[in-house]
Amino acid sequence: MELKLLNANGQEGAAVNASDVVFGRDYNEALIHQIVVAYQANARSGNRAQKDREQVKHTTKKPWRQKGTGRARAGMSSSPLWRGGGRIFPNSPEENFSHKVNKKMHRAGLCSIFSQLAREGRIAVVDELTLEAPKTKLLAEKFKAMGLDSVLVITDTVDENLYLASRNLAHVAVVEPRYADPLSLIYFKKVLITKAAVAQIEELLS
C-alpha cells in the first residue's frame, strides 16, 4: 500500500510504501464496531448512582389509613411509584461496564481502520513534524498550508513544543503510535503520520 507524502507546504511528494499487513487489509465493519464499543465501555468511569427505596430519606409512616379515604392504598412515601421515591432498579457504581477484546482482535481491528483510511485518502505522511517554539499560531499555519482542519497527528515521539501548541487547537490531537485508539482514528477527518511512526505502527500491529 502506498501512502501520500506531504511536505511543509502541503504539496505531495513521492509515495511512501507501507506494509499491506497493516495498511492493506479488507474492511471488517463488525470487528471495528466491536473494538470501538469496547474502547468506549472501558473508558467509562462507572460512577453513576441512584437510590432505591431503602436509601431515599423518607419517613416510613403510612401516608393515610388503609381504608375509608377513597384514595389508593399506600404504605410509605419512598415507594418507587411516588414522585421523589426510590428507583426500582437503580444504577450502581458497582456495575461492570468492561468489555474484553483479545489482543489479536484489537490489532486486526486497528489494521482494518488504518487500511480503510488509506483507501479513502485520509492518511498523509510527513518526514517529521516539529516546532521551534510552543506557539499555537505556528502549528495552525502548518496545518493550514497542508489543508488540514481536523487531524490526528501520530508521531514517533511527542515533541514538547508540538504538544503544547496543539492543546489550544480544536479538532487536533497528538499521540504516539501506542496510544492511537480506534475512536480517534475514526473521529478525525485526517490522520497525519511521521515516517518513523509508520515503522512503529507496522511493528506494533504486524
From Swiss-Prot:
One of its GO terms (molecular function) is structural constituent of ribosome. Residues 58-70 have a biased composition (Basic residues). It comes from the Bacteria. Residues 44-85 are annotated as: Disordered. Keywords: Ribonucleoprotein, Ribosomal protein, RNA-binding, rRNA-binding. GO terms for biological process: translation. GO terms for cellular component: ribonucleoprotein complex; ribosome. It holds the Pfam family Ribosomal_L4. Part of the 50S ribosomal subunit. One of the primary rRNA binding proteins, this protein initially binds near the 5'-end of the 23S rRNA. It is important during the early stages of 50S assembly. It makes multiple contacts with different domains of the 23S rRNA in the assembled 50S subunit and ribosome. Forms part of the polypeptide exit tunnel. Belongs to the universal ribosomal protein uL4 family. This is Large ribosomal subunit protein uL4.
